[in-house]
């Protein structure tokens, strides 16, 4: 009867791969060298059959839906951008000026480009009128500061309320009712714009004269830094009086500058009529 050899029989050192007999580490040529590779960790592809990862179908569906939405938004944005460019091009072809906000440079809120939109012979006069508008902005801003100092010292809330109204209404209204019409008149030579400017600018000059005087019968107490309010305040509080005298000087300078602008614009309008 044939007996199968026992693979675990230590008697046959040549067949036992774990035997160190005889030759130690460097065995003879008759011995077969067995190489070992490190065992692979059990994981994907190990064991009975290959393991699979189940991806929820609803997740895949949501991803596809989001991709479609993003694609739709992108298409819509491109369409709107093309439509805006087409309208701008149509306006340019029709001769309508495109007014992009560019002033002040750090926070553009208005369009202002004297160098490119006003004729060269009128640019100096327009810059002078622009200085007049900046002057009333400075006057009303300083008036607000001076009245705030007086309000803190005396505690009259009406002063604070009126000074706030002067600043919040006076600055934007001065731009809208007389500076912007003059800018338009210089650019288009519109007689109507010139007429509107003259009317509103006379009101502006009248306000500056009254503010420089600050009579208590017109404005409440010390809500304007005119000469009368400055003298009254200086006799009580020197520091506050200095604030008021500075405001008085600013209103005087603004009045003189505005009168000069009015004369020059009127001379140009009469000569160009």
From Swiss-Prot:
Listed Gly residues bias regions? 20-30
Q: Which UniProt keywords apply?
A: Cell membrane, Coiled coil, Cytoplasmic vesicle, Membrane, Transmembrane, Transmembrane helix, Transport
Question: Short name of one Pfam family for this protein?
Answer: SCAMP
* Compartments in which it is found: Cell membrane; Cytoplasmic vesicle, Secretory vesicle membrane
Q: What is its main location?
A: membrane
Q: How does it sit in the membrane?
A: Multi-pass membrane protein
Regions that span the bilayer? 132-152, 159-179, 194-214, 239-259
The answer to whether the entry has keyword Membrane is yes
Q: Where is this region: Disordered?
A: 1-69
GO cellular component terms attached to this protein's record? plasma membrane; recycling endosome membrane; trans-Golgi network membrane; transport vesicle membrane
Coiled-coil stretches = 68-94
Query: Which stretches are Cytoplasmic in the membrane topology?
Result: 1-131, 260-273
Q: Which family does it belong to?
A: Belongs to the SCAMP family.
Protein function: Probably involved in membrane trafficking.
User: Could you identify this protein by its name?
Assistant: Secretory carrier-associated membrane protein 6
Source organism (scientific name): Oryza sativa subsp. japonica
